[in-house]
C-alpha cells in the first residue's frame, strides 16, 4: 500500500471541513491548500468570454434571486442532514492549511511536488488548468454537488429537483482530467 499522504485542494467552506474530517480519520492528510475567493467581476468576465452574455446574465439573475433564498429555506434540512450523518464541521487546524490565491498558481505545483501525495482530493475550487493538471504526478478526485454531466455547475441538485428528476440529485465523485 502507498504510504504517501493525501493532499486536499479546496475552497473555504463547511463542506471542506466535512471532507477533511472524514478523510483524516482513516488517512494521513498532509495539507489542505485553500484557494482564495476570486473577485466577482473577474469571475463574471471570464464566464462571459466562455459561455456568452445571455447565459451569464441568466446565471447572475439566478444567484441574486433564488441563489440568495436557497440557503435560508434549506438551513433546517442542512442541519438535519449534518446531524443524521454525524458530519464533523470542526474547522481544520491552522498548521494544516496553506492559503493560495488560486489552485492554478505555480506555487501550488511546487507544494504538490514537495509533498508528493498519493492522491489529491478537490472540493469546491475553480476549474484546474490543463497546465497544472498535466504536471500533477498522482490521481486527482473531485467531489461535485449534482450528478454530472446532466446537471453541471454549483446548483446541479437544485436543477434536478426543479426538473422533477430526483434520481439525478446527488453528489458525483470523479477522477479529474483535462477534459471538461
Predicted regions and their residues:
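One-carbon transfer enzymes
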Residues: 1-180
Amino acid at each position: 500500500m502507498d504510504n504517501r499522504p493525501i493532499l486536499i485542494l479546496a475552497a473555504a467552506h463547511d463542506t471542506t471541513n466535512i471532507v477533511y474530517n472524514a478523510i483524516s480519520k482513516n488517512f494521513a492528510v498532509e495539507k489542505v491548500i485553500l484557494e482564495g475567493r476570486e473577485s466577482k467581476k473577474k469571475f463574471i468576465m471570464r464566464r462571459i468570454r466562455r459561455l456568452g452574455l445571455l447565459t451569464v446574465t441568466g446565471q447572475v439573475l439566478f444567484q441574486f434571486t433564488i441563489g440568495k433564498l436557497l440557503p435560508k429555506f434549506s438551513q433546517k434540512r442542512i442541519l438535519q442532514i449534518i446531524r443524521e450523518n454525524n458530519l464533523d464541521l470542526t474547522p481544520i487546524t491552522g498548521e494544516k492549511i496553506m492559503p493560495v490565491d488560486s489552485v492554478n498558481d505555480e506555487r501550488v505545483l511546487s507544494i504538490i511536488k514537495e509533498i508528493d501525495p498519493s492522491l489529491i482530493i478537490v472540493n469546491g475550487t475553480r476549474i484546474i488548468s490543463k497546465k497544472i493538471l498535466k504536471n500533477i504526478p498522482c490521481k486527482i478526485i473531485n467531489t461535485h454537488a449534482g450528478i454530472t454531466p446532466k446537471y453541471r455547475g454549483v446548483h446541479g441538485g437544485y436543477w434536478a429537483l426543479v426538473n422533477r428528476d430526483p434520481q439525478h440529485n446527488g453528489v458525483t465523485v470523479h477522477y479529474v482530467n483535462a477534459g471538461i
